[in-house]
Regions:
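Serine/threonine-enriched low-complexity regions used as flexible
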Residues: 2-13
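Feature responds to low-complexity, polar/acidic, surface-exposed segments characteristic
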Residues: 12-98, 106-127, 134-159, 170-184, ...
């Protein structure tokens, strides 16, 4: 909705009271999920640094984002859109994230810059990340709503940001802004990825600390704690109902072995005969 604030006049009073627009938190609900993302298996999809830290306030690169979503595709989608080639001048077959970039480009999820580059080591902004995340959902272009005070009607990213808001992937800040050109943090990115996967972690329903991978810069008092634990710990779960929602939140039931994504991608790569081609039988 476009209003940033409202003024209400209490009964029997001549004074007006200002009410800022509330900032709502969304989750993707039933029926609004993605058909090409693996929403069933709760695999971890990021790892920490060699020094043992997760750096939730650190930035994330375009190549890393492509790799995360590539790993989280359904097997059917990955098979259908598999590619090892692309038209970017800075993404050749030797690039560590080439398969991810090529496949997601083939899906139409990501694209590059007007100079023909993709810039895999470049940082990614909040608007760019929103565009990628909402690309996995079927959405329709709607009239400009003005959800955020710093998103103009004619900006290149407006339709993507507003669509991502409508399907419940993103939210803005308490001051009514979205800050589209600010680089997204690792914590913010994981929150959006979890929403895209319809994952609903809650701190009180995780496993005991001793049974999880933990991080010195990610503690239960941090706002991003549950989402970062979700992103870094593979686990089994069951759904908990609340308020008529059968899938209101997830309760972890067991820690699973971490998936070896490098080995997984190698096996998938060798199983294909050609970029975008058939699986070798």
């Amino acid at each position: 909705y476009p209003n940033v604030k409202a003024w209400l006049k209490p009964a029997n009073s001549s004074e007006q009271i200002e009410f800022p627009r509330p900032m709502l938190s969304y989750r993707v609900g039933g029926g609004g999920g993605s058909s090409v993302l693996n929403t069933d298996d709760h695999y971890s999809y990021i790892i920490g640094y060699k020094d043992g830290y997760l750096r939730p306030y650190g930035t994330i690169t375009r190549g890393e984002v492509a790799t995360i979503f590539f790993r989280l595709l359904t097997d059917e989608a990955r098979d259908k859109y598999w590619s090892q080639t692309n038209n970017y001048s800075d993404c050749n077959s030797d690039l560590w994230c080439n398969n991810a970039i090529s496949t997601l480009s083939n899906m139409g999820i990501i694209d590059g810059y007007s100079d023909g580059t993709f810039r895999p080591y470049g940082k990614i902004t909040r608007a760019q990340f929103a565009k990628i995340a909402v690309g996995f959902f079927e959405t329709t272009t709607q009239e400009y709503q003005g959800y955020y005070s710093d998103i103009s009607e004619n900006a290149w990213f407006t339709n993507y940001v507003e669509a991502a808001s409508r399907v419940g992937l993103i939210q803005g800040f308490a001051d009514g802004t979205f800050r589209p050109n600010v680089n997204i943090t690792r914590a913010q990115a994981c929150v959006i990825v979890n929403r895209a996967l319809d994952r609903k972690p809650a701190t009180e329903h995780l496993l005991p600390t001793a049974k999880m991978i933990n991080w010195p810069d990610c503690t239960p008092s941090d706002w991003y704690y549950a989402d970062m634990q979700e992103a870094t710990n593979s686990h089994d779960y069951r759904w908990l109902a609340s308020g008529g929602d059968a899938k209101a939140m997830e309760k972890w039931t067991a820690k699973l072995p971490q998936r070896d994504w490098a080995a997984f991608e190698h096996a998938w790569s060798t199983a294909h005969s050609a970029p975008g081609g058939e699986v070798i039988k």
